[in-house]
Amino acid sequence: MAIFISVPSYKDPLLTETLCSAYQNAKFKKNLRFCVLDQSEHGIEIDKLVFKDQIIYENVPPVISKGVCWARSRIQEYFENEEYYLQIDSHTIFQENWDEILITYHDWLKAQNNDFVISSYPRAFTCNKTLTEFELDTKFQGTYGMSFKKGDVFKYDIVSIQTAIPTSSSEPLKGHLVAAGFLFSSGNFVKEIPYDPEYYFHGEELAIAVKLFTRGWDVFHIPRTPLFHLYTDVENLPRDLHWNPKDEENRIKKWTELDAISKKKIESLFSGEVDGKFGLGDKRTIKDFGIALGLDFEKKEIVSPDLAFTESRFLKVINESVPFASVLADNK
């Protein structure tokens, strides 16, 4: 039951820590297959890792990078029909037995759902300035749903800023939005919802969500996600961002141009002008997607604040034959 793990990284000093954390905390270590696109000047010492044979590693200069979606798309080219697909960021810490937990979640949900992804903003971790000590936020035991941030709806034309909504649910919830830094699914996701390399940053998650919806896929948020993400203010980041001025000086295609192309592509997606594998599906409509989220994408208006901003949109998942509590009692 192999897991293909997509890890794009941009000059991230936590890349090695992320890889080691995933490997060391996995129950079935031999089933992991990492694919890393390291956008940095010097790269990391892959040969020193005991699991180096399980890593596909590509190191490219930052000046040729075209953004995170370009990186995720390039990584997906190495997918070889693994049973599961895990997409993360390069500043992630894993809980013990995370792989068994995610697969158990997936199999429990699959009993009543065909095509779906498990995704949400993970709980946080913090670290010291030398990146040697880590503190995981394990206090929250509920489920983080995903919604929109008040005041930032349609902030970038069609794109709104997303946020996590803490709920008291101890069981999975059905939602509609995804987090690009944590997405777990069957390997079919790579085949049916491949990443468009022309997306840049803003709109990445919305584009994936609307493609999932219109192609008949569902989204589930899970309790106690077994991995943790580094959330920091830009001023305190221990790494450079893609639009760092120093990198921009030598970059052939500037980030502003990449961002403009991306926004135009996302607008075209919502107007139905994108065909083929990067386009929408025909199982459900954009109008229905908007109704579910409390938004009107055509008019760019909020039609239901409750659906847009609160947990009232989330649906509990019921499996009467196998109660959820019986399958994941150890995930705490």
Predicted segment positions?
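Catalytic cores of eukaryotic secretory-pathway lumenal/extracellular enzymes that build
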Residues: 2-296
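Non-catalytic, C-terminal membrane-associated alpha-helical segments of glycosyltransferases
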Residues: 272-332
